[in-house]
Amino acid sequence: MDLKTGRVVKVSGPLVVAEGMEEANLFDVVRVGDERLIGEIIEMREDKASIQVYEETSGLGPGAPVVTTGAPLSVELGPGLIEAMFDGIQRPLDAIEAKAGDFITRGIDVPSLSREKVWHFNPTKKAGDKVETGDILGLVQETSVIEHRIMVPPGIKGEIISLNEGDYTVIDKIGEIKTDKGIEDLTLMQKWPVRRGRPYKRKLNPSAPMVTGQRVVDTFFPVTKGGTACVPGPFGSGKTVVQHQLAKWADAQIVVYIGCGERGNEMTDVLNEFPELKDPKTGESLMKRTVLIANTSNMPVAAREASIYTGITIGEYFRDMGYSIALMADSTSRWAEALREMSGRLEEMPGEEGYPAYLGSRLAEFYERAGNVICLGQDGREGALTAIGAVSPPGGDLSEPVTQATLRIVKVFWGLDSQLAYRRHFPAINWLNSYSLYLDKVGPWMNENVAEDWVELRQKAMALLQEEANLQEIARLVGIDALSEEDRLKLEVAKSLREDYLQQNAFHDVDTYAPLNKQYRMLKAVLQFGDEARKALESGVYLKDILNLPVRDKIARAKYIDEKDILSIDEISKELTKDIEDLISKGGILDA
């Protein structure tokens, strides 16, 4: 279709207004100026279109041509996504570097998926088979870890006329389907508009936890596969390290990491670390299951708004194959700031703190695309997409609009605390403020799959930490010596729980990841010390004798015990029981 060319009448930073655009539609992608800068129509008034331009607009002036492509902002979905690094509108950064150097040249046009790379396609269906949207046509081994399942594109159903094994690029024809509307060609790639969620049969209630290997998360505030979580915290409290830890060790088959408006160095860290680290499940490099979207703080603001949608659309595509996906967005605050900037330039009525009135609905749109679903297709496979967003409230103020709008939507809140971070307690997740609404689902799963007293131990530990907070308040007023020995013991056990269990070193080879069976044994050992010590106190043993037991050091060092030697934690528990019994028999006054 030959569309009329419009003309620029106003340029205001990333916002460009063009007239003569009556043939264009809302959310169409347009090319602006002689350099053909990429932009998207975000508002239409008569023949005038307001366009957010995803590139630097300096040098652009009134009278410059604007051409609409007639299509919405879409991503290319096919082999070549894994291990790739894209910007916010899915331009491949490695291909841009090869073509134009270290910085993205304005107006550069590079296909998202390589048109040269050849993939070997193995069909799982044959000519004559009846297929519908979502059915798996065949497989491409994308990396040594990920098998890319080629699906029937949305909106197509019918009978396969031909489907051939062989080596293809993403745009080569691999077969044909006869539909009601005629014959459709099949390729390894499909396109999908980023602002529209991909279809599925139905949503399921999430129940299995997404194991992260982070003790404070898995034990106290678990997130399910297909769940939503947010990590708000002030600057320097460790949001990015928490996100990196989850991306490294989460029990997901594919990780989509969106660096949205954060520092470039943080994406560099990911690029440097992930290829070196081994996935505990496959033994392969973590990069072989990761898609990176880098939209750093020095890239155009408008592209931040798109980067979140680009990332979640890629996540949904892999979810449709039947995979479990973990999506990290770091940080949604920068995305909200981009919304605020565009809203201000559009002269819309501002809401709270200048954010647009539709901030809450946009956030909800994003998080609602997560979930545990039955995918389209005749085999009824399950897929899960877990969304975890970091929020950076200015000054750590959790009452600001982005945090509040996020908390209304997500079910897990990991509140990072600057006081804990200053005390070098990492991950700095505050156990008194944080919560998980998935506990009633995850608890029975843990009792069944890990240990039958998991929920009971968790409740005891939480009660102890709550009691510690109350006792510390009293100790600050009247001094620790005024507390009874039993209360001082509670403070010591809670301290052990905090320092020996909740604290975790992200940069230690062993402590960076703790499997569930190790977490259970460690928690049990700490709480067992509390129970046994209380018995000893009641039998007349002095508190200092209990606290000086050498076995306490072994409990503290249990976090550094390798997964292979996990049974040695049980030995520590036996030694603890024996030492306390010896203390009672030597120095205690046993009840008659």
Curated annotation (Swiss-Prot):
InterPro entries: ATP-synt_VA_C, ATP-synth_a_Xtn, ATP_synth_asu-like_sf, ATPase_a/bsu_AS, ATPase_F1/V1/A1_a/bsu_N, ATPase_F1/V1/A1_a/bsu_N_sf, ATPase_F1/V1/A1_a/bsu_nucl-bd, ATPase_F1/V1_b/a_C. Keywords: ATP synthesis, ATP-binding, Hydrogen ion transport, Ion transport, Nucleotide-binding, Translocase, Transport. Gene3D superfamilies: 2.40.30.20, 2.40.50.100, Bovine Mitochondrial F1-atpase, Atp Synthase Beta Chain, Chain D, domain 3, P-loop containing nucleotide triphosphate hydrolases. GO terms for biological process: proton motive force-driven plasma membrane ATP synthesis. It catalyses: ATP + H2O + 4 H(+)(in) = ADP + phosphate + 5 H(+)(out). Belongs to the ATPase alpha/beta chains family. Produces ATP from ADP in the presence of a proton gradient across the membrane. The V-type alpha chain is a catalytic subunit. This is V-type ATP synthase alpha chain 1. The gene is atpA1.
